[in-house]
Amino acid sequence: MNKRLSRGKISLLASVFVTTTFMGGVNVLASTAKTGIRDITSQQVVKEMKVGWNLGNTMDATGGETNWGNPLTTHAMIDKVKAAGFNTLRLPITWDGHIGAAPDYAIDATWMNRVEEIANYAFDNNMYVIINLHHEDGWLKPYYANEAEVKAKITKVWTQIANRFKDYGDYLIFETMNEPRPVGAADEWSGGSYENRDMVNRYNLTAVNTIRATGGNNALRHIMVPTLAAAALSTTMNDYIVPNNDSRVIVSLHMYSPYFFSADLTSQWTTATWGSDADKAALSADFDAVYNKFVKNGRAVVIGEMGTINKNNLDSRVKHAEYYAKEATVRGITPIWWDNGYCVAGKEQTFGIFNRKNLTWCCPEVMQAFIRGAGATQTQTSYSLGDVNKDGKVNAIDYAVLKSILLGTNTNVDLSVSDMNKDGKVNALDLAVLKKMLLS
């Protein structure tokens, strides 16, 4: 999705966690198994990806990581996502605003470092990571008149990204673009014109060729490549061209389906109810169209974005999440939930299911249904950071328990919930961080 949220209060806790210093060069923190390219197909990779979660409205936020109301990303956040059963992190990134002038289009080193730092949080959890070009609509225009300029910039930008990550293994997946489309046109979301679709194919080819040309592991890296607007429409799928018929290209689609249930709140057609036999048949038909076009013909597919907004309709959302994940998985397709961090019910764009400020699932039933439908499993019984007494809530009682630990009257210490600043110790600093969390 590409609508920004209104600015929210930034968590005071977040700044405590982000202290990693980069020493230059490629900083591969993942295990050895993640630093090689295996002899497996893209379909096998997608099967291993299982089910995913988007770190939305964060590194894709224009102006900076916290500009759209989410806190700084921490290792603990990604730990929590992995523990819930998600095996893939999609990391949407807006590079525009962090790119220098032509002809070099140099990417700001601090921004590149931060991207790598967050990616490594997921690699440390043995997760797949997807890195893309996200809100680049200001320059990535799908028109013949813009072709030369756009291709030059794509080449420079992807060369820098690909070189930075070329030593990472096949748990890292590149995605050429997010939702390339004719922004502002009447047919922006309904397939665009032939010119638009043709230009998206050309830009995808430029990106894939650029990535492959950097060599190293990028020569065989699996790359996600979208249709126009990443839409699963007959026009966009029929005019889609796989760059070079590359066997390691994965089709990237976004399916907020059915739209008026999943993503619409204000139109006359909006609905908060889903789950009838007719509803299920219609959603299955959407997946059949994707399967018959691509998967049946040996082409791997990832649904890079899906989700439902919170309309105070928990029962329908749970039914939809489980059925959606099941229908995708049985067809060999990985679904990835779009989480923009916005959990408040009854407002537009409330796709959030995870509260990153207190590390709790704001819609646990929806999350569990999604995981269940995909056949994934939780890796462990996990508790939120700060839930010192492990009762499933973070509140003043946890503050009292942590204080008793520091006073020596309680020796039952679990670093995973008590070490608030992740420095390997439990002391007064952690008590201060917990206090800030409770007050935020």
UniProtKB/Swiss-Prot annotation:
Residues at the active site: 179 (proton donor), 305 (nucleophile)
Membrane-traversing stretches: none
Enzyme nomenclature, EC number: 3.2.1.4, 3.2.1.8
One GO MF term attached to the UniProt entry: cellulase activity
Pfam families: Cellulase, Dockerin_1
Record flagged with keyword Cytoplasm: no
Alphabetized UniProt keyword annotations: Carbohydrate metabolism, Cellulose degradation, Glycosidase, Hydrolase, Polysaccharide degradation, Signal
Catalytic activity field: Endohydrolysis of (1->4)-beta-D-glucosidic linkages in cellulose, lichenin and cereal beta-D-glucans; Endohydrolysis of (1->4)-beta-D-xylosidic linkages in xylans
Annotated disulfide bonds: none
Coiled-coil ranges from the UniProt annotation: none
Gene Ontology cellular component terms for the protein in this record: cell surface; extracellular region
Record keyword Hydrolase present: yes
Endpoints of the signal sequence: 1-33
InterPro entries: Dockerin_1_rpt (IPR002105), Dockerin_dom (IPR016134), Dockerin_dom_sf (IPR036439), EF_Hand_1_Ca_BS (IPR018247), Glyco_hydro_5 (IPR001547), Glyco_hydro_5_CS (IPR018087), Glycoside_hydrolase_SF (IPR017853), Glycosyl_hydrolase_5 (IPR050386)
Domain Dockerin per the UniProt entry, residue ranges: 381-440
PANTHER family in the record: ENDOGLUCANASE, PUTATIVE (AFU_ORTHOLOGUE AFUA_5G01830)-RELATED, GLUCAN ENDO-1,6-BETA-GLUCOSIDASE B
Misc remark: Up to 32 AA of the N-terminus and 52 AA of the C-terminus are not required for catalytic activity.
Family: Belongs to the glycosyl hydrolase 5 (cellulase A) family.
Known function: Has endoglucanase activity on carboxymethyl-cellulose (CMC), xylan and lichenan, but not Avicel.
UniProt-recorded name of the protein: Endoglucanase B
UniProt source species: Clostridium cellulovorans (strain ATCC 35296 / DSM 3052 / OCM 3 / 743B)
Organism lineage: Bacteria, Bacillati, Bacillota, Clostridia, Eubacteriales
